[in-house]
Structures are given as structure tokens and as C-alpha cells.
Amino acid sequence: MVWKVRRVVTGHDQDGKSVFIMDGYAPNVLEMASMPGLALTDLWETKGAPASNDGNADAAARPVHLEPPKNGTILRIVEFPPDSQWRQSADARKAFDSIGAGHAPDKHSADPMMHKTSTVDYIIVLKGEIW
């Protein structure tokens, strides 16, 4: 079951004062049909560096894709099911294709989910373990 993640976003009112503009469950969730139990929840995206804080638009309101824009970032939660639930029936190629990353799988790795991109990924395990 996919976690419902509360996302609180601040912005600015007409006087430039910081205010809360969003407070609710993150709406941008993708459950991977080709990999049962794998889910991506995007919380925010920046288009480049330095990031702009102009406007109050939802920066995560767009289709889920693997890589951020050039010099940009994605704040994402990835939920991995236990290997026993998906490893045998997984279709990694379909999964990567569905998020615009058919070029990313690492053909030299025995793990179908390993991939290479021009990004730096920070991973924090909140629950369970990753092998």
C-alpha cells in the first residue's frame, strides 16, 4: 500500500510575506504497473540552479519522470516492496520506459533496477532494508 505523504509548501502573499500555500497529501504519486508495489511520490522539483522562489505554482504538478531538468532537482519518495513480492514478475524495461528513462538501465549490472544517469541521488532508508 502506497504511503500517503503530507506535504506542506510555503510561498508568498501579495505583500511578500511567507505564508502556507499548500498543506495536504502529495498528489503526484505513480504506482509502477510493471513493478508491483513500487511507487514514486514526487514532492517538489526545481528547474535549475539557483532555484527560483517566485510564484506559488505547484512545482511537482507534472508527470513523474526519472531525471530532473538539467541543473535541477527532484525531491521524491520511492517505496520498494520486498524483493519476494516483485523480483520475479518485474519488468524493469517497461518501468524505466514509463518514466521517460529507457536509456538509463545499467546493462552491466545483474540488478534490473540499477541505472546510470547524470544525477546525484541521496537515499535515506526510512523503513526496512535495501539489498
Located regions from the model:
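A short, N-terminal "cap"/entry segment at the start of jelly-roll beta-barrel domains
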Residues: M1-P105
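Short, conserved beta-strand element in jelly-roll/cupin
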Residues: E79-P82, H115-W131
